[in-house]
Swiss-Prot record:
NCBIfam families: salicylate_mono. It holds the Pfam family NAD_binding_8. It comes from the Bacteria. Its cofactor is FAD. Pathway: Aromatic compound metabolism; naphthalene degradation. Disulfide bonds: none annotated. Its EC number is 1.14.13.1. FAD binds at residues 12-41. This is Salicylate hydroxylase. GO terms for biological process: catabolic process; secondary metabolite biosynthetic process. It comes from Pseudomonas putida (Arthrobacter siderocapsulatus).
Length: 435
């Protein structure tokens, strides 16, 4: 056979980290014959820390675009009729008085993390995932990467995608390659008590306390000074996910003890004491006998997500606070963006630097804005915004439309811009799509 017609070897893509976005990316990429995908997970099996997770309309579009819509909708919850358009109702923490609602147009979409992960795992072909593989070192040798793992094994690839979480080992490699200092996660000063409540139990508690059962069915957010509480249903309404946030603003740069775990068991009394004076919302917390306490950390905005042939996605790149329900969604947007480009048969080892440059240029500014506004949103919830303060009417008005820019972001336009940079799409095609 003529060498010019010889089939090119498949591009070797290694994904380090098997959470929702890493697994979603692997599932999308492994469908393409020009890609050889391997997923490396440090744990002995796939698993997600946490319970319920909420997705905005933008994240749901990414899920569908990745070809995972059917798996998602089989396990996801939606706000029931006639409140199907509501994302959250906003209420005063002291007495649950109604302050307003945010209308997403598609309502709240939420899922138990473990359920969604299990649904994805069922579709992963054999031979893609390897477990107990914790990456410790990366060496670039020409156009090839050598990944070393703690167990002494190695893997050689053309592209490495780091989705290894907020404590990412690969982030140091990327930042050092850019001549930047290593960035550690930072404690936000906010902790969250988390628990899951049987919806029937919660209904009974609300009946006893004379609280409208509507608050069980529709996602709620109770707002107060230095704290807020959110609820939304999961597992087809059988369970209500509860997260109660409390913030200490006594230190301008709060720290968490280096030897203290980020997640620990807590007592109900400790949680109730943190929300003394919160009225009806305490009836909700009284249904959680053994909460867990989470010390919430995030990352500073990174100066870059890419070095050489290594790219960071998800929490490894932009770990953020949960106040906009956007962290997991941003990881899925990263996955969608890369899947649309890497899945093109014109992707090859020679144009990977250009492709990754487009990813960094087009995804990073948006993800950084989400990180930044998430912190601001938390201050708004807890009546600490420097302009709005405790003006509850104004808080409700702002929250009604605050997330529109996030939910309506046109990720396909970003992909089209990247394809234009790659020479894969003409200006006329983009104009036609936007017109």
């Amino acid at each position: 056979m003529n060498d010019m017609n010889a089939k090119k070897p498949a591009l070797r893509v290694a994904i380090v980290g098997g959470g929702i976005s890493g697994l979603a990316l692997a599932l999308s990429l492994c469908k393409h014959s020009h890609l050889n995908v391997q997923l490396f997970e440090a744990a002995p099996a796939f698993g997600e820390v946490g319970a319920g997770v909420s997705f905005g309309p933008n994240a749901v579009r990414a899920i569908v675009g990745l070809g995972l819509g059917q798996a998602y909708f089989q396990v996801a919850d939606r706000t029931p009729q006639p409140w199907e358009d509501i994302w959250f109702e906003w209420r005063r923490g002291s007495d649950a008085s109604y302050l307003g609602a945010t209308i997403a147009g598609v309502g709240q979409s939420s899922v138990h993390r473990a359920d969604f992960l299990d649904a994805l795992v069922k579709h992963l072909p054999e031979g893609i995932a390897q477990f107990r593989k914790r990456a410790t070192q990366i060496e670039q040798q020409g156009d090839e990467l050598q990944v070393l793992f703690r167990d002494g094994t190695e893997y050689r690839c053309d592209l490495l995608i780091g989705r290894d979480g907020i404590k990412s080992a690969l982030r140091s490699y990327v930042l050092e390659g850019q001549g930047q200092d290593h960035l550690e996660p930072r404690f936000s000063g906010t902790c969250a008590y988390r628990g899951m409540v049987d919806s029937l139990q919660l209904r009974e508690a609300y009946r006893i306390n004379g609280i409208d059962e509507h608050l069980v069915d529709v996602p709620q957010m109770y707002l107060g000074l230095y704290g807020h509480i959110l609820t939304f249903p999961v597992r087809k309404g059988r369970i209500v996910n509860v997260v109660a946030f409390t913030s200490d603003r006594s230190q301008p740069e709060p720290t968490w003890p280096a030897d203290a775990p980020w997640v620990r068991e807590a007592s109900q009394r400790e949680m109730l004491d943190a929300f003394a004076g919160w009225g009806d919302a305490r009836a909700l917390l009284e249904c959680i006998p053994a909460p867990t306490l989470w010390a919430l950390h995030d990352l500073p905005e990174l100066p870059g997500y890419v070095h050489g042939r290594v790219a960071l996605i998800g929490d490894a790149a932009h770990a953020m606070l949960p106040h906009q329900g956007a962290g997991a969604g941003q990881g899925l947007e990263d996955a969608y963006f890369l899947a649309r480009l890497l899945g093109d048969s014109r992707t090859e080892t020679g144009n990977l630097p250009e492709l990754l440059g487009a990813y960094d240029d087009l995804r990073r500014p948006h993800a950084c804005r989400v990180q930044r506004t998430t912190v601001e949103t938390g201050e708004l919830y807890e009546l600490r915004d420097p302009i709005v303060g405790a003006d509850e009417q104004l808080v409700g008005e702002i929250l009604a439309t605050r997330f529109d820019w996030l939910w309506n972001h046109d990720l396909d336009a970003d992909v089209a811009e990247a394809r234009l940079r790659m020479g894969w799409e003409a200006h006329e095609q983009i104009a036609l799509r936007q017109g």
